[in-house]
């Protein structure tokens, strides 16, 4: 039987220990052993070697990036909490106490001192938590895991200890239960959808609340005119997104710092001048009295109180730009004292002027009072800084939404669209044109339709609290599976924060008909899109996997119908599969009976880690006899890595291919020994079995699928011990350079997916209508990869799933 075998570096069936030892001693740099074994480690600010000077600098920079949203909340919290006015003067003490302890419990205790430590090699957010869990337990739906992936820098992590049966039990349940996998996936896309809703509502409520202050100087302005001014600012905000923030980003921290100084100073002034006894709100007993006095009305008011913690998730999501210590310092030393003083001062002011609750912030600015309206010298500076702070808060939320969506693309949850990186200095600064247009349009429509911050706040709170709850549930899994904390601590975490968030959510849901329905509509649309796309993406992958062409049939495939011509140049065929020859290739050969002199099957694969070092980017394998010059390449990226431009990508790939050929020759002297130990290749092993309990491979099946029973050494052998074609290595490298000079052609499949004839109505709607609509209207295909049209060849193919 003439077929190719690949020999596993350790523990492969049919490989003698001597061969394994030989392979392990040779430090190869091809993708299947050497590159995977290298540990270069990405630089990150979270390292223990970071000095205090760097940490303090990062703490200052973090003020402008992650605190704009939560820092501008004083613009609208009291007006949202008391939409019908203040019923009792002591209600202010109870609400202030609620605000203070909400700030302490959720942002400070939960996020700053617990959640930040669950980062994924420095990156935070809902998607990072899901990726972290997926490295400990095989919960991802697409069966493209390879043993080499676990050897990439930043990937390998300590497995759960065998002494801790609970962690092993949780891991087993997650891997064997389809319901558990679906639940975690559902939580992830729910969190992503709510962040997108947050990114739509943050600009609307922040800009509208800041602009509303102009009516203090121009009381003749109508609310319609205020809305139109806000719409103009929003239009400019979304229009300049494509330029990024590289040129002006350095001003964010100073502007937000000035904002915090202003609101802290104004709050301190109001506290001293109006009523210093408001400090008794630090006694939580006033919360109990507030609910006793107001009952259901007090419970409903929690929907306004929770707006004081908007933007909290940003501390975690933007952690990749800073480190834990920097965020802890900036929160506890800058943010919390500033906003706490602001809320305390506003409460002291409202105790004296409760009728001004609808516009507390601007009317509490110190100055000479004339008919209880402020005309002091601080008004215009505060108004201008408030506008700038609102824009920065919106910009930070938009940047976070773009970054999260770019991560969702790597999970296969959205159509492939082009992600534009707007900064060469700061990673993670991305721009997605289609998403920017839809979010900008939605934000403007919301501003025009709702008109007031109170109405928008009803919708805003649902996005905020739902994201909190998603993080709480994922964090509980992290504590059980990865941190392996004591069960008492885990239960305490889940009960305290889960109960707090459920109470807030129940309050916000009471305002469902008053605007609360909006984020649910956003979430339903986005989740339907992501779930449908991911479902078809997985089913399509399985279809291709079930119809792979065995490597042993490559020779007969290339020689059918009188033979296939080898034309000059390099052909790169893109495929989702990481093993086997995709069904697209036979169709290409039959339609166009020619194959390029150097032919490479390319798979772009996203690993559940933030970054993959450039030296570890490519995995190569020889496909068939060496003389045919047919290769497989898996290009691996982290979920925050940017795809290179085509020319740069091709240059890196060719360099890696030549290195692979160079070091393949190092195995020639050991070929006979390994051949004697190797079994005949069994193509059936390359076809992974479906697990009866889930749509993901079992661990054994993944091993077989990803490597054809073998992985680490990537030695390509002839079954009969026949040595590879004798060709001088340097000559072969020159041949590759020559073919590259003759042109590189990119080949892609234009797949049309349809539901099978026996499919249910729901499946037909999802596949034939929703998926098809998304594919035709949103997918950019080769444009997302920036492939030039004059170098592209598309091959049509139909899949019936």
UniProtKB/Swiss-Prot annotation:
Pfam families, per database record: K_trans, K_trans_C
GO biological process terms, semicolon-separated: potassium ion transport
Location (main, coarse): membrane
Keyword Membrane (UniProt): yes
Expression induction or repression: By potassium starvation in roots of young seedlings.
Taxonomic superkingdom: Eukaryota
Alphabetical keyword list: Cell membrane, Ion transport, Membrane, Potassium, Potassium transport, Transmembrane, Transmembrane helix, Transport
Tissues showing expression: Expressed almost exclusively in roots.
Intervals, Cytoplasmic compartment: 1-57, 116-181, 241-247, 320-328, 399-429, 483-487, 533-801
Protein topology in the membrane: Multi-pass membrane protein
Extracellular topological segments: 81-94, 203-219, 269-298, 350-375, 451-461, 509-511
Stretch forming the signal peptide: none
Ranges that cross the membrane: 58-80, 95-115, 182-202, 220-240, 248-268, 299-319, 329-349, 376-398, 430-450, 462-482, 488-508, 512-532
Region (Disordered): 1-20, 679-728
UniProt-annotated location(s): Cell membrane
Keyword Transmembrane: yes
Any Gene Ontology CC annotation: plasma membrane
GO MF annotation, one: potassium ion transmembrane transporter activity
Biased composition (Polar residues): 704-717
Free-text function comment from the UniProt entry: High-affinity potassium transporter. Also transports rubidium, with the same affinity and cesium, with a lower affinity.
Family, as annotated: Belongs to the HAK/KUP transporter (TC 2.A.72.3) family.
Name of protein: Potassium transporter 1
Recorded name of the encoding gene: HAK1
């Amino acid at each position: 039987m003439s077929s190719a075998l690949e020999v596993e570096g350790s523990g492969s069936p049919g490989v003698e220990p001597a061969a394994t030892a030989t392979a392990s001693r040779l430090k190869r740099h091809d993708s299947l052993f050497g590159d995977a074994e290298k540990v270069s480690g990405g630089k990150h600010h979270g390292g223990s070697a970071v000095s205090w000077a760097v940490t303090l600098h990062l703490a200052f920079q973090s003020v402008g990036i992650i605190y704009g949203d939560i820092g501008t909340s004083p613009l609208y919290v009291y007006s949202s909490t008391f939409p019908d006015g203040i019923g009792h003067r002591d209600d202010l003490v109870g609400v202030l106490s609620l605000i203070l302890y909400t700030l302490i419990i959720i942002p400070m205790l939960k996020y700053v001192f617990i959640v930040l430590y669950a980062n994924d090699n420095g990156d935070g957010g809902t998607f990072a938590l899901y990726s972290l869990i997926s490295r400990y337990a095989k919960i991802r739906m697409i069966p493209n895991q390879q043993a080499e992936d676990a050897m990439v820098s930043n990937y390998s992590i300590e497995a759960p200890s065998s002494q801790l049966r609970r962690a092993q039990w949780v891991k087993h349940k997650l891997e064997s239960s389809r319901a558990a996998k679906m639940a975690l996936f559902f939580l992830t896309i729910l969190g992503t959808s709510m962040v997108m809703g947050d990114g739509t509502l943050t600009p609307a409520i922040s800009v509208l609340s800041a602009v509303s202050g102009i009516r203090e100087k121009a009381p003749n302005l109508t609310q319609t005119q205020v809305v139109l001014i806000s719409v103009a600012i929003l239009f400019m905000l979304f229009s300049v997104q494509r330029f990024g923030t590289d040129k002006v980003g350095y001003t964010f921290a100073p502007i937000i710092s000035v904002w915090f100084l202003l609101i802290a100073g104004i709050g301190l002034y109001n506290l001293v001048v109006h009523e210093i006894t408001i400090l008794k709100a630090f006694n939580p007993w006033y919360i109990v009295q507030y609910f006793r006095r107001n009952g259901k009305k007090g419970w409903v008011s929690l929907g306004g109180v929770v707006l004081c913690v908007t933007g909290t998730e940003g501390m975690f999501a933007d952690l990749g730009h800073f480190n834990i210590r920097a965020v802890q310092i900036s929160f506890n030393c800058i943010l919390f004292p500033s906003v706490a003083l602001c809320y305390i001062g506003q409460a002291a002011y409202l105790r004296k002027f409760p009728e001004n609750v609808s516009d507390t912030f601007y009317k509490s600015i110190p100055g000479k009072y004339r008919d209880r309206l402020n005309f002091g010298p601080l008004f215009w500076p505060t108004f201008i800084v408030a506008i700038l702070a609102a824009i920065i808060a919106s910009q930070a939320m938009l940047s976070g939404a773009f970054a999260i969506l770019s991560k969702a693309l790597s999970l296969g949850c959205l159509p492939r669209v082009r992600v534009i990186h707007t900064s060469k200095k700061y990673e993670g600064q991305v721009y997605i044109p289609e998403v920017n247009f839809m979010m900008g349009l939605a934000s403007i429509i919301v501003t025009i339709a709702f008109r007031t911050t109170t109405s928008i706040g009803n919708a805003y709170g649902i996005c905020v609290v739902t994201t909190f709850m998603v993080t709480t549930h994922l964090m509980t899994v992290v504590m059980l599976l990865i941190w392996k904390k004591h069960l008492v601590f885990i239960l305490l975490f889940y009960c305290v924060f889960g109960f707090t968030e459920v109470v807030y959510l129940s309050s916000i849901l009471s305002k469902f008909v008053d605007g609360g329905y909006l984020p649910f509509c956003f979430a339903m649309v986005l989740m339907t899109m992501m779930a449908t796309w991911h479902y078809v993406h997985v089913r399509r992958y399985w279809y291709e996997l079930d119809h792979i062409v065995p490597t042993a049939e490559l020779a007969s495939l290339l020689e059918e119908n009188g033979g296939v011509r080898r034309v000059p140049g390099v052909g790169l065929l893109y495929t989702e599969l990481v093993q086997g020859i995709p069904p697209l290739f036979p169709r290409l050969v039959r339609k166009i009976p020619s194959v390029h002199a150097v032919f490479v099957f390319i798979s772009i694969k996203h690993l559940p880690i933030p970054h993959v070092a450039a030296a570890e980017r490519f995995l190569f394998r020889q496909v068939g006899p060496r003389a045919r010059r047919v290769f497989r390449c898996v290009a691996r990226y982290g979920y925050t890595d940017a795809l290179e431009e085509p020319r740069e990508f091709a240059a890196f790939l060719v360099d890696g291919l030549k290195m692979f050929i160079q070091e393949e020759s190092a195995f020639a002297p050991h070929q006979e020994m390994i051949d004697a130990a190797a079994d005949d290749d069994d193509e059936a092993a390359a076809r992974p079995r479906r697990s009866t309990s889930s749509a993901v491979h079992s661990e054994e099946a993944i091993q077989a699928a990803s490597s054809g029973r073998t992985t680490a050494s990537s030695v390509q052998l002839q079954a009969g011990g026949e040595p590879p074609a004798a060709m001088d290595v340097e000559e072969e490298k020159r041949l590759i350079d020559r073919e590259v000079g003759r042109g590189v052609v990119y080949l892609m499949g234009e797949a049309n997916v349809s539901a099978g004839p026996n499919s249910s109505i729901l499946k037909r709607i999802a596949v034939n209508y929703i998926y098809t609509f998304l594919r035709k209207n949103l997918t950019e295909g080769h444009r997302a990869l920036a492939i030039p049209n004059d170098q592209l060849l598309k091959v049509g193919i139909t899949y019936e799933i």
